[in-house]
Amino acid sequence: MSEKIASINSVVNSFIWGVPAMICIIGVGILLTVRTRCIQVRKFGVAMKNTIGKIFDKTQTRDGSMSPFQAVCTALAGTVGTGNIAGVAGAIALGGPGAIFWMWCSAFLGMCTKFSEVTLAIHFREKNKNGEYIGGPMYYIKNGLSKKWHFLAVFYAVFGVLTVFGTGNATQVNTIVSSVNTALMNFNILKGEPNSNVNLIFGIFIAALVAMVLLGGIKRIGQVSEKLVPFMAVLYVILALGVIILNIQRVPGVFAQIVSGAFTPRAATGGIIGSMFLSMKRGVSRGIFSNEAGLGTGSIAHACADTDNAVHQGMFGIFEVFMDTIVICTLTGLVILLAAPNISYVQAAGAELTISGFTATYGGWVSILTAIAMCCFAFSTIIGWGLYGSRCIEFLGGEKFVRPFLVVYSFVSIVGATMNLGLLWDISDTFNGLMAVPNLIALLMLSGHVKKLAIEVDQAEKDGTI
């Protein structure tokens, strides 16, 4: 059965992530960059000031909303996940070091794409019966385009619901149990193969935590995210910087390897496995899986923000992609490549490959810290995507379906704890591509609107409101 699913998925994935998809994703990013006059560069300083500078802002929010910082933390909770760890490792193993270069290119354009998504989400959002702000691609399609295009909103929401179970939950739980098993085996608590009982126990525990947070509503999601995301990011950055400092003499060579590998692709194992397009495909697809620019998902969380300034919140989107891909994904890639002489890329995969990079430098004890970081990354992603899925199901069927959906979503954590990692990543890649289609069409058609809103950045800066 799994072989048949893998075969079908392979055909669909090849089409979704083929040349047309690469052209569409990169093309929309270039178009938005041109129409906003490269806002991710022009206003980068403003974006940093209005994100990092707001970390300790404790301004009270209205009921049914999050603070702007809670919103960006929730969006980062959804984006800073296993794509930064297991996804980058997989991209390097299959596409070579050059995949990181294509992640950078994807992120540069993605910063503008995410800015556009967030700005449109705030501009076209609505309030539901509970007084909560609701927005995202479904709503900027519905409220920004004519009725004949509204089927795209339904299409997006349907694939959004399907995507959250794999991308948002199952793959994340799989990485949690994988990293925990690796840590336990490094300390000889487990012998040989990963223990299925450990996987099941962690699956049940995670499911209970997920239900407790998500069923607590938008306020609880925001409160958990604003505490968890900064902690996990700082912990991971410190660990990664330690590896870089201890291997500082090899860093220039690794960067040269990344750039040259982008145009002469070669797997980290040393064997030629394809053309430049393979490296590009792996880098761009994993980059999108990681930062979600082009998927529109992060804008769903940003739409909950207690702000009346769409462009101001759009600045958070620039920071989000920068932090996710340029910082954390790059650090992951450097950790793996700097530890390359001590790692078997054939035997290790996903999270295990990243953990091997840390243990090769620090020793086996660090697997506990990396397991904690990965558990935080994955759990935060599950929470963020739970919000995305609930908004999609609310758009399709109304608020009465939200709580039943969240119960089912929580239960999927148990299922995901015992599934095959490789097939999970492949299926998630496919659903990501399908979800991006209606969003990219909407961004293309609303690019003129984005241009008008982007002009407000300069005016707002002159007026002192940003």
Regions found by a protein language model. Give the residues of each.
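Flexible loop linkers connecting adjacent transmembrane helices
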Residues: 38-66, 90-92, 96-100, 104, ...
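N-terminal alpha-helical transmembrane segments of multi-pass membrane transport
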Residues: 1-82, 92-99, 110, 245, ...
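Membrane-interface loop-to-helix entry segments
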Residues: 24-31, 35-48, 173-180, 197-247, ...
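Membrane-embedded translocation segments of transport machinery
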Residues: 216-219, 223-226, 231-298, 303, ...
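Extracellular/periplasmic helix-exit of transmembrane alpha-helices
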Residues: 117-129, 241-257, 265-271, 304-307, ...
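Helix-loop-helix module between adjacent transmembrane segments
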Residues: 31-33, 106-131, 138, 142-174, ...
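Transmembrane helix-loop junctions in multi-pass membrane proteins
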Residues: 3-5, 35-40, 83-88, 166-176, ...
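Alpha-helical membrane segments and immediately flanking helix-loop junctions
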Residues: 59-94, 120-144, 155-161, 273-322
